[in-house]
Amino acid sequence: WVINGRKYFSSNASVASFFIVVAITDPDVPVHRGASTFLIPAGTPGLNVEATHHLFGSLPHEAGHSLIRYENVRVPASSMLGEPGHGFEILQARLAGGRIHHAMRSLGVAQRALDMMAHRAKSRFTQGSLLADKQLVQEFIADSYTELLQFRLTVLHAAWLIDTFGEHAARKEIGVCKVLASSVLKSIGMRAIQVHGALGMTEQMPLTNVLLGGVAMGLADGPTEAHKVNLARMFLKDYEAEDPEWPSEFTDVRIAAAKAKYGDRLDRIPALPRS
């Protein structure tokens, strides 16, 4: 195979010993059936790291994300992972597990931010009282705990579905986890910064990284907007269209359906509305 193209945001490419590359091998079919996965050793002729960028707030030792140019990169047939045209399936198998792992890590980060918020609220005395005694701060803590508990239970439920029925059965729940990971990190991170004041914005505290981590979670492994669209489509597949004029829960419609099912027995119900 000869591979040509460019790929941005190849994570850890600057230190990798091999690259996982998904490339179109059959352009005449839809992408999900025309992509194949290759394992390409670093240093292969034609594989060039053109630039490496780092996320804002990343640590000095992090390898960053690179722009790669593939210029007539020749690889043997044995470099293909799996069968031709199955690259999308391999990619999706990795992404499903990766997304719930993102959620698990985000849970721990959000819990730490909430702990920091609570410690600061119980410790900082200003304007005649502790922060913990001020109603707006109490609302911050209550809202954060509520969001975190919902997120935690959603992740646990998704993990149970995966363990019990497999990843395919948990597709909707994995999507929910991915959406919540971003929103919960951002909201709890922002509140934690507010409770810590200007100190929370300094490099001496990890809270800006919590907030930026929430932003990153809204982009990593697919943007939040794409996950919401896909989630809605999967959810709506379980529902059928009704009469476009009258919803099924409209009272007259329900009475007609009940009469069709139970007949004259409904006449003995005095509270039943009469049309």
What positions do the PLM features span?
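Alpha-helical interface subdomain recognition
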Residues: 67-69, 86, 93-275
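Conserved hydrophobic/aromatic beta-strand scaffold that supports enzyme active sites
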Residues: 18-22, 37-39, 65-72, 90, ...
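Flexible, small-/acidic-enriched active-site or ligand-binding loops
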Residues: 45-74
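A short core secondary-structure module
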Residues: 4-50
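Short alpha-helix boundary/capping segments
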Residues: 10, 30, 56-62, 83, ...
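Long, acidic (Asp/Glu-rich), low-complexity accessory segments flanking structured domains
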Residues: 72-89
